[in-house]
Amino acid sequence: MSFKLWREGRSFSYSWKGTKEVPAIKPNCGIKVLYEPHNPIVDLVFVHGITGHRDHTWSADRNSDPWPKLMLPSRIPEARILTFGYDASVIGFWRSISRNSIGDHSNNLLSALSSFRSNAELRPIIFIAHSLGGLVVKDALLSSRASPEPHLRRILDCVRALLFLGTPHYGADLADIGQRLVKLAGLTTAKTNRKIIGVLQRDSEVLFRIQKGFQELLRSQQKDGTRTLEITCCYEELPLMGMSEIVPSESAVLHGYPAIGIHADHRGIARFASADDPGFVSVLGELRRWIGQVVPTDDELEKEVGAVKRKRSNNRWANRKRGGKSCGDTGAITIWGNVTRSVITNGDQIIQGNLVFGGSRA
């Protein structure tokens, strides 16, 4: 990678060519909705990687919309599509950059997602993560598991599947590239984030902690007989600018889980220009398969009933404290959940099960 490329503020996951104009930087932090159907049954959450952007990482061209926004709504209309952004810059010549660690970014993801889903706390989640974003997602799930806060623990309970795109589970050459950039920056006044670079080293203690904790999480799910996570790992088949693969398959693939090779380099593995792209076809196939499995189980419906009862009880108590009527006094019908497996409240009555609207069965 050239000094000129990084001096001009180019994103690792955007472009390695040093001849294009640099567009104005768009907002990148937090959650952004790319598509929201009337009655979603699942949240797809996209998380970019090192020096990435919540829009540009997923865009075949800098001036185009992200492919999840362009190509998924017509093919997976029942899914809400979200993208999460964070400052994962390694070096900044003309601007300040975040000094956040992986743990900071993962906690921000967990908190932002929990807050954003406050009205849909039980909706299933599928993560699609590129590069470093996969480590952020895994660490967020570990934080969710260990959190004393119910609303944060609930995130892990809702996660159904993880799709990793070039995630360096066991380290990557990204670290070597980053170290060279940091040394280069030492000759200038550039700002650097060594915390991000350090985690990508193959002997990184942080990387070891995340991977060890994640494997323990998967084993505990299998041992407890709870719903286990569906996982697919995609790896790059092409080198980047004549180099070796940035994240080779032996680092990008978790042992014992399905692996898919995508005929692209580390940048292109997250960008699809058309619906005919073989990489997109593979990713779409996995998403459709998982979404077909997200219909709530009986145990999950029982949990949903409990959540509805608690919410109704809290609302009734708050209304009576204010001297008003409770929700149960209105006689109105409220539907919680999706039309396939739902929970309906009518006054003090709660109905759960399969619902066929416009038919004779409820």
Residue ranges and their predicted role:
Residues 271-287:
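Post-His helix in hydrolase/transferase enzymes
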Residues 74-90:
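Conserved alpha/beta-hydrolase
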Residues 48, 91, 101-215:
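Serine-dependent carboxylesterase/thioesterase catalytic core
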Residues 50-52, 86-91, 132-134, 142, ...:
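Conserved beta-strand elements of beta-rich interaction domains across eukaryotes
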Residues 56-62, 94-98, 139-143, 174-180, ...:
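Short coil/turn segments at secondary-structure boundaries
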Residues 28-78:
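Short, surface-exposed "cap/lid" segments of acyl-processing enzymes
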Residues 222, 237-265:
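Active-site-adjacent alpha-helix of alpha/beta-hydrolase-fold enzymes
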Residues 3-21, 309-362:
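Long, low-complexity intrinsically disordered regions enriched in small/polar
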